[in-house]
Regions:
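Short acidic-hydrophobic surface loop/beta-edge motif
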Residues: 2, 96-103, 227-231, 256-258
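N-terminal active-site segment of His-dependent metallophosphoesterases
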Residues: 2-67, 72-80, 139-146, 150
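Beta-strand-turn-beta hairpins that frame and shape the catalytic cleft
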Residues: 11-17, 99-109, 230-235
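Active-site neighborhood of phospho(di)ester-bond hydrolases with catalytic His/Asp-centered motifs
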Residues: 18-20, 39-44, 65-70, 93-97, ...
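Active-site environment of divalent metal-dependent phosphoester hydrolases
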Residues: 23-29, 46-50, 71-78, 99-101, ...
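A basic- and aromatic-enriched beta-loop-alpha substructure that forms the phosphate/nucleotide-
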Residues: 65-136
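Active-site-proximal loop/helix segment associated with metal-binding centers of metalloenzymes
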Residues: 108-177, 182-193
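Binuclear metal-dependent phosphoesterase catalytic core
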Residues: 190, 196-216, 223-260
Length: 260
């Protein structure tokens, strides 16, 4: 586990500036000035290393935590995490099933690919096949010499979930913030998408993990509808900009911050 800072974990408070799904591959974004100590980027900032480079330009001094989304991998191999980390300056940390302790706050970061079991094991095969036909993830991302497949997503999900549970089992004397790109609970699905057949490609059922370990805050992206709610004793938030045609309709707050 990486560690920065030597501040008393119990007395620490930290303001986080939270953004996701900026999709700078379609239109640039100039973030507002913020007094937040730490910047959280929950994926789909830009394609490949361009999102990391964007963050490095706009946040040259303060700590940045960057969790890759699905779009970071478009046109690239699913195993490009080393490239993202190599492109990051010293103040920016890419988390991909990685933990970071920063000034008394523990951050656990994972893309959290889905297992397609949102509606249960019996529906998972149908969910995978719909995603295979309809999701660009399984067209535009490579896995070695093949295309990335829903079955690969399941393997990655299981590895990430196992890693996350092991981290949460470790006692930590301070706030714990989980940052994922994909949705951790069905409650994060916006009401207008409640019956969307592709929801299992966006969200997984980690409600049991949240109930058992109750991290302080869970930040995610992927859906282009903001959310902010309590699940057990965990606050769950998402603050996505979305695609150019969605600007102004979803409730994105460029200045959104949370104190932990």
């Amino acid at each position: 586990m990486l560690r920065f800072g030597e501040v008393d974990a119990v007395s620490t408070t930290m303001k986080l500036h939270i953004l996701s799904d900026l999709h700078t591959e379609f239109a640039d974004f100039v973030p507002p000035e913020t007094d937040a100590e730490t910047i959280i980027l929950a994926g789909d900032i830009g394609v490949g290393v361009e999102g990391v480079r964007w963050a490095a330009r706009h946040y040259p001094a303060r700590p940045v935590i960057y969790v890759p989304g699905n779009h970071e991998f478009y046109g690239h191999d699913i195993d490009m995490i080393a490239e993202l980390k190599a492109a990051a300056p010293e103040n920016l940390t890419v988390l991909s099933d990685d933990a970071l302790v920063l000034d008394g706050v523990r951050f656990l970061g994972s893309t959290l690919w889905t297992d397609f079991k949102l509606h249960g094991e019996g529906e998972a095969w149908f969910a995978r096949e719909r995603a295979r036909r309809c999701m660009n993830d399984f067209v535009r991302i490579r896995h070695g010499r093949q295309k990335f497949r829903p079955e690969d997503s399941v393997v990655l999900h299981e590895a990430s979930r196992t890693w996350l549970v092991r981290q949460l089992e470790q006692v930590f004397d301070g706030p714990t913030v989980v940052v994922t790109h994909h949705l951790p609970a069905s409650k994060s699905i916006a009401p207008r998408y409640a019956n969307d057949p592709l929801n299992p490609a966006f969200a997984s059922r980690l409600e049991d993990v949240i109930e058992r370990y109750q991290p302080t805050l869970w930040i995610h992206g992927h859906t282009h509808e903001p959310c902010d709610y309590e699940l057990f004793r965990t606050r769950v938030v998402c603050n996505p900009r979305g695609y150019p045609g969605e600007y102004g309709r979803g409730g994105f707050k460029p200045e959104f911050t949370v104190v932990v």
